[in-house]
Swiss-Prot record:
Catalytic activity from the UniProt record: 5-[(5-phospho-1-deoxy-D-ribulos-1-ylimino)methylamino]-1-(5-phospho-beta-D-ribosyl)imidazole-4-carboxamide + L-glutamine = D-erythro-1-(imidazol-4-yl)glycerol 3-phosphate + 5-amino-1-(5-phospho-beta-D-ribosyl)imidazole-4-carboxamide + L-glutamate + H(+)
Species for this entry: Vesicomyosocius okutanii subsp. Calyptogena okutanii (strain HA)
Family to which this protein belongs: Belongs to the HisA/HisF family.
Main location: cytoplasm
Identification of the protein by name: Imidazole glycerol phosphate synthase subunit HisF
Function comment: IGPS catalyzes the conversion of PRFAR and glutamine to IGP, AICAR and glutamate. The HisF subunit catalyzes the cyclization activity that produces IGP and AICAR from PRFAR using the ammonia provided by the HisH subunit.
Pathway: Amino-acid biosynthesis; L-histidine biosynthesis; L-histidine from 5-phospho-alpha-D-ribose 1-diphosphate: step 5/9
Length: 255
């Protein structure tokens, strides 16, 4: 484990506010995106992920003005997703100050999109987002549109396909829909299966309820980064508390 493990707070944004739900529903307000992002930057987060969670459903573009406002306030890598369908969308978001973009639904409808974008912008700034749900023993399917539509695609095979070769995605954002917001920990079998299947970093997402869960994602799930929302948004823990807890478990982090 040579590289430091990243702790990444996630900003799910709906109607201009940071929100958090349970299994993609039961939404609660968690504040203004710019203020929340600024706080995480000051707390020592390694990155921030901004997801415009209704852009794909509404068929509209990502909130560029909000990306610009956040980028002006934070000095850590910013990944943006939601409503990205073509190269022009990526260019606009990167020009607004984002460092990376993440794509979910659009890649399902156009499997060559990741390859095209990686060629144009570099695979290091393209993240494939996978929302997976268990459909059988050791088998997970991919869902899109905020978890509303089942695609019939196997999550492990999709992760391999989207990251293979020189022009695959440079990172996987893996969310367990079964665990999202439930606070019982990551789906460690899913996380491990994807981490073992791909040669790029995997961000584990969905289910963090305490600091021990973050370490489990790394030590048992083999994740390269751990994402959380609820435990940070509502003041249960700080980023520094999370990092110190992981360090105590022998995990290399940036303090």
């Amino acid at each position: 484990m040579s590289l430091a493990i990243r702790i990444i707070p996630c900003l799910d944004v709906c109607d201009g506010r940071v929100v958090k739900g349970t299994k993609f529903i039961d939404i609660k307000d968690a504040g203004d995106p710019v203020e929340v992002a600024k706080r995480y930057d000051l707390e020592g987060a390694d990155e921030i992920i901004f997801l415009d969670i209704t852009a794909s459903i509404d068929g509209r573009d990502t909130m560029i003005h909000m990306v610009e406002a956040i980028a002006e306030q934070v000095f850590i890598p910013l990944t943006v997703g939601g409503g990205i369908r073509k190269a022009a969308d990526v260019r606009a978001i990167l020009n607004a100050g984002a460092d990376k973009i993440t794509i979910n639904s659009a890649a399902i409808f156009n499997p060559n999109l990741i390859n095209q974008l990686s060629k144009e912008f570099g695979s290091q700034c393209i993240v494939i987002a996978i929302d997976a749900k268990k459909i059988d023993y050791n088998k997970w399917g991919i869902f899109t549109h905020g978890g509303r539509k089942y695609t019939g695609i196997d999550a492990i095979e999709w992760a391999k396909k989207m990251t293979c070769g020189d022009n695959g995605a440079g990172e996987v954002l893996l969310t367990s829909m079964d665990c999202d917001g439930v606070k019982t920990g990551f789906d460690l079998l899913l996380t491990r299966a994807v981490s073992d299947a791909v040669d790029v970093p995997v961000i584990a997402s969905g289910g963090v309820g305490n600091l021990e869960h973050l370490s489990e994602g790394v030590l048992q799930g083999a994740a390269d980064a751990v994402l959380a929302a609820s435990i940070f948004h509502f003041g249960e823990y700080t980023i520094q508390q999370a990092k110190k807890a992981m360090q105590e478990n022998g995990i290399k982090v940036r303090l």
